[in-house]
Amino acid sequence: MAQTGTDPQARIEALRREIREHDHRYYVLDAPVIADAEYDALMAELQALEAEHPELITPDSPSQRVAGRPAEGFGEVTHAEPMLSLDNAFEEADLAEFDRRVRQALGLDPVVYVAEPKLDGLSVSIRYEDGRLVRAGTRGDGRVGEAITENVRTIRSVPLRLRGEGWPPVMEVRGEVVIRRADFERLNEQRLADGERPFANPRNAAAGSLRQLDPRITARRRLTFFTFGVAAAGRLAASHHEVLDKLAGWGFRVNERVERVRGLDGCREYYQRLLADRDELSFEIDGVVYKVDDLDAREELGFTARAPRWAIAWKLPAQEATTVVRRILPSVGRTGAITPVAELEPVGVGGVTVSRATLHNLDEVRRKDVRKGDTVMVRRAGDVIPEITAVVTEKRPEGAEPWAMPAECPVCGSEVLRLDDEAVHRCMGGLYCPAQREGALLHFASRKALDIDGLGEKVVSQLVERGMVRSPADLFTLEHCQLAGLERMGDKSADNLVAALDKARRTTLPRFLYALGIQHVGEVTARRLAEHFGSLEAIMNADESALAETPDVGPVVAQAIAHFFAEPHNREVVQALRAAGVTWEEVDPAERGEQPLAGRTFVLTGTLSGMTRDEAKAALEALGARVSGSVSKKTDYLVAGEKAGSKLAKAESLGVEVLDEQALQALLQEHGR
């Protein structure tokens, strides 16, 4: 019951503060100071007062964690900074090599790292503005994830309103959503009692709970959020461990096993301690993450295209089991790679029922000598990917034959080829092969290919599933009424996509070549081919020796191009695209002009005011230059715009010539660009 004789607003605020404090003590600190019945009484009083005074309800009130009705679907969230994955270490030697690279790059020995358990859950990013939770999303592809705000609000270890003071006006808190082992067991017991299929493991339970359209279901799953960092917040401190301390002070849960360690020996010792305690932990883990603690050092180390150079995940040893191979099947991936997959008698491994295991490639099948009917040892590498580690040859049945790679793609019938420098066999069906369709279409529409704005993964998936698009040429037959009928499309988005498709009909020969997705043909190679041959017909009809004469095209790339165009299906795709109106201007090899910057390597950094970095890159490459993403002793020039950062400092230390934007413009004008 609500108290009488007091100011309702003041009492509501007092109740909210008290409930937030108890939530923090219970769900973050694991140190409650009142009984559940007392907590329930406080919440009941707050809810009663807010019911009497609905004008006083605020989104960050503890009573508003659970939305009242299911959502119709998940929207998208664009992360302020990409949520990159981590490189993995599967053996101690991998960790030692990582430490060596870091020490060498920084000139430090030893390096101080922050070590933390790699929780086996779902990574999420939670955005706060002025101290209040406004948005939450999954990792997704690293740039765009699914909006799960209402579900994340139900997690009691996630503050709806930040504690303390000193937090930035905007920040994205990154972390892992997990479910305790004990809560997972109770959840599965209840699902069995309700006649539902139990979850295979805690990670699946956590991920499935976050993707419920009804947040009331999520609220009943007792999820926990552990933060492991922050983005888009500016410089909060000098080190990662200080940032974690600040996040803890603002109300977030930081894993109690996070520690600072010194050098490789400290990393090893932490790993062994955590491994020894693994079965006693309340949460599932699948490894240890090591991060360079000093944030200036992180900036100096930088990133690769997919992962930071200052962090690594050392995977824990997998658990193994014995089972029997029913048969070996060739599986065609989205890039055309054909992977032998062993179909197994189902067996439990690390809490998961395993019925298939990858054999990677033909060399691996031969090395392990896996055959149909064999008894094998199976493990989940890093507790995730099932693989066969050994064959018990003593139990091999008589007449078991070695497995052979098929000569034709099991999906489309195209030639299967192993390029000279590759371990994998590939289907040469390219854009024609149904198994490669979605991946090929996404590549075809990507920014550096035909740049079809609005044709993302979810749209392509629907178009393929509904049979609306079987080849790239089908894209150009799509009409507004067809697109508007897709999920989360709408009239305006359909109009925009139709316009983008129409615009994409007018492209360039290098972009078209790149869009075809030929193995080893990137944007630079595509441009070299266009410049060397001048027309698509000349490229399609060239043999391997003629192709290999192209600058930057060696025998392996020439082989891939020749086999791609030797496949009749691929020629039919090209013909269909031209019939659909895709055009470009041919390049006259005789009029390509000089390449005055051939052999010179440039690096671009910072913000340019007169052009984008992509435009600057294109202009330099048109003059024969190579544009790299990192500074090294082989770099000839660094073009430094505003806020150039660590690349400028490294260039100066290596004696690399630095050009400002004005000097770049002068260089381009000198050569007629």
Swiss-Prot record:
<protein>
    <recommendedName>
        <fullName>DNA ligase</fullName>
        <ecNumber>6.5.1.2</ecNumber>
    </recommendedName>
</protein>
<comment type="similarity">
    <text>Belongs to the NAD-dependent DNA ligase family. LigA subfamily.</text>
</comment>
<dbReference type="InterPro" id="IPR004150">
    <property type="entry name" value="NAD_DNA_ligase_OB"/>
</dbReference>
<keyword id="KW-0227">DNA damage</keyword>
<dbReference type="InterPro" id="IPR001679">
    <property type="entry name" value="DNA_ligase"/>
</dbReference>
<dbReference type="InterPro" id="IPR010994">
    <property type="entry name" value="RuvA_2-like"/>
</dbReference>
<dbReference type="GO" id="GO:0003677">
    <property type="term" value="F:DNA binding"/>
</dbReference>
<keyword id="KW-0235">DNA replication</keyword>
<feature type="binding site">
    <location>
        <position position="433"/>
    </location>
    <ligand>
        <name>Zn(2+)</name>
    </ligand>
</feature>
<keyword id="KW-0520">NAD</keyword>
<dbReference type="Pfam" id="PF01653">
    <property type="entry name" value="DNA_ligase_aden"/>
</dbReference>
<dbReference type="Pfam" id="PF22745">
    <property type="entry name" value="Nlig-Ia"/>
</dbReference>
<dbReference type="InterPro" id="IPR013840">
    <property type="entry name" value="DNAligase_N"/>
</dbReference>
<keyword id="KW-0479">Metal-binding</keyword>
<dbReference type="GO" id="GO:0005829">
    <property type="term" value="C:cytosol"/>
</dbReference>
<feature type="binding site">
    <location>
        <position position="427"/>
    </location>
    <ligand>
        <name>Zn(2+)</name>
    </ligand>
</feature>
<dbReference type="InterPro" id="IPR033136">
    <property type="entry name" value="DNA_ligase_CS"/>
</dbReference>
<dbReference type="InterPro" id="IPR003583">
    <property type="entry name" value="Hlx-hairpin-Hlx_DNA-bd_motif"/>
</dbReference>
<keyword id="KW-0460">Magnesium</keyword>
<dbReference type="InterPro" id="IPR012340">
    <property type="entry name" value="NA-bd_OB-fold"/>
</dbReference>
<keyword id="KW-0436">Ligase</keyword>
<feature type="binding site">
    <location>
        <position position="176"/>
    </location>
    <ligand>
        <name>NAD(+)</name>
    </ligand>
</feature>
<feature type="binding site">
    <location>
        <position position="116"/>
    </location>
    <ligand>
        <name>NAD(+)</name>
    </ligand>
</feature>
<feature type="binding site">
    <location>
        <begin position="85"/>
        <end position="86"/>
    </location>
    <ligand>
        <name>NAD(+)</name>
    </ligand>
</feature>
<feature type="binding site">
    <location>
        <position position="291"/>
    </location>
    <ligand>
        <name>NAD(+)</name>
    </ligand>
</feature>
<dbReference type="Pfam" id="PF12826">
    <property type="entry name" value="HHH_2"/>
</dbReference>
<dbReference type="InterPro" id="IPR013839">
    <property type="entry name" value="DNAligase_adenylation"/>
</dbReference>
<dbReference type="Pfam" id="PF14520">
    <property type="entry name" value="HHH_5"/>
</dbReference>
<comment type="function">
    <text>DNA ligase that catalyzes the formation of phosphodiester linkages between 5'-phosphoryl and 3'-hydroxyl groups in double-stranded DNA using NAD as a coenzyme and as the energy source for the reaction. It is essential for DNA replication and repair of damaged DNA.</text>
</comment>
<feature type="domain" description="BRCT">
    <location>
        <begin position="592"/>
        <end position="673"/>
    </location>
</feature>
<dbReference type="Pfam" id="PF03119">
    <property type="entry name" value="DNA_ligase_ZBD"/>
</dbReference>
<dbReference type="GO" id="GO:0006281">
    <property type="term" value="P:DNA repair"/>
</dbReference>
<dbReference type="InterPro" id="IPR036420">
    <property type="entry name" value="BRCT_dom_sf"/>
</dbReference>
<dbReference type="GO" id="GO:0046872">
    <property type="term" value="F:metal ion binding"/>
</dbReference>
<feature type="binding site">
    <location>
        <position position="139"/>
    </location>
    <ligand>
        <name>NAD(+)</name>
    </ligand>
</feature>
<dbReference type="InterPro" id="IPR001357">
    <property type="entry name" value="BRCT_dom"/>
</dbReference>
<dbReference type="Pfam" id="PF00533">
    <property type="entry name" value="BRCT"/>
</dbReference>
<dbReference type="InterPro" id="IPR041663">
    <property type="entry name" value="DisA/LigA_HHH"/>
</dbReference>
<feature type="binding site">
    <location>
        <position position="409"/>
    </location>
    <ligand>
        <name>Zn(2+)</name>
    </ligand>
</feature>
<keyword id="KW-0862">Zinc</keyword>
<dbReference type="GO" id="GO:0006260">
    <property type="term" value="P:DNA replication"/>
</dbReference>
<feature type="binding site">
    <location>
        <begin position="36"/>
        <end position="40"/>
    </location>
    <ligand>
        <name>NAD(+)</name>
    </ligand>
</feature>
